[in-house]
Amino acid sequence: LLLIMRERTPITTKLLNACTNLKLIITSGMRNQAIDLKTAKQKNITILGTDTHSNPTAELTWALILGLARNVREETENMYQGYWQTTLGTELKGKTLGVIGLGTQGTQVATIGKAFGMEVIAWSENLKIADAEAKGVLAVAKEDLLARADVVSIHLVLSERTKNLIKYDDLC
């Protein structure tokens, strides 16, 4: 039996014990944090992951940022009602992009922000100043990022450590 799943799908001891013929699990990523690895190893179940692509995440992030900055939804609705460009939107050049989590995806988002002429600042608990500088980004404290950024983009794995890391009041 072969199981192909998203990497966040829980594969528990109960499920592994119920699948008596399971030999291989293939996930859509490499973290495999949702799999009971100990039980899988005991049952000689092989676990493989696929290489993830961060480009689609960065592209979607920028689609959403641009959509908000240029009022795409509102302008599309107005166009269908016969109106043309009722708002100006916001120019991103000269604005500040705050990236929380400067890993692969955060770095790609930061690179695109710089191409738009944005100042890019970043924070994560383990971000080293030299690493940020090597990427052309300024490392700042989380509070400073939240106070200065015109746009905040979060690129952290959701975990108990990161849950509630940023609250509503932090963004207002």
Regions inferred by a protein language model and the residue ranges of each:
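Conserved beta-strand positions in the Rossmann-like core of class I SAM-dependent methyltransferases
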Residues: I121
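Phosphate-coordination loops involved in phosphoryl transfer and adenosine-cofactor binding
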Residues: L22, K93-V99, Y168
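An N-terminal-biased, well-structured beta-alpha scaffold segment characteristic
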Residues: L1-L48, A147, K167, C172
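Glycine-rich Rossmann-fold phosphate-binding loop(s) that bind the pyrophosphate
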Residues: L102-G103
